[in-house]
Amino acid sequence: DSDPSRGLGDVYKRQILHRIKPVEGRLEKIGKLKNNSRVILDYAHTPDALKSAFLNLKEQFPNNNINLVFGCGGERDFKKRIMMGKIAEKYSNKIYLTDDNPRNENPSKIRKDIKKGIKKSNIYEISNRKKAIEEAIKNLNTGDLLLVAGRGHEKVQDYGKRKILLSDKKVILQSINSKNKFLSKNFKLNIINCL
């Protein structure tokens, strides 16, 4: 009987629930496209967090393909890279392997380490994170999910002495907008061709 909501009316509970905002960058549903595909942003940068994100999405969307954009940070937990690759392979349909925050480490070496855990052929290696996200969204099929993992709410990509302003969320929103314009244009063309 230690339920803190005990005695609160259902209407009041619903009002409270509507005010609760999700944590930025944690399984954050950024947008839904006109072809019913969705893009989710998550800070998952460890094997456990990545697996948990996949399992959560599989539970919510059991019949949808899940594609993944991710990389691993530099100068951190070298051993986790192969494990992250194995998890990506097990739970995703397409993998867009890209840079995370390489810091002072060679980004291509980081990607090479991750690929040791991936055996499937549907892996696209695009070092430029912005381009990787754009490409992944451009290639979303009807009902697909895209999980963009690793950096969450971060606004700066760390290349050691070089820092790049990069918000995964902004890139996602811009790419969704472009994809939706493309889908609308194609829908109109299809209607005209059917007449």
Describe these PLM feature segments.
Residues D10, Q15-L195:
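ATP-dependent carboxylate-amine ligase
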Residues D1-Y12:
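Short, small-residue-biased leader/transition segments that mark boundaries at the very start
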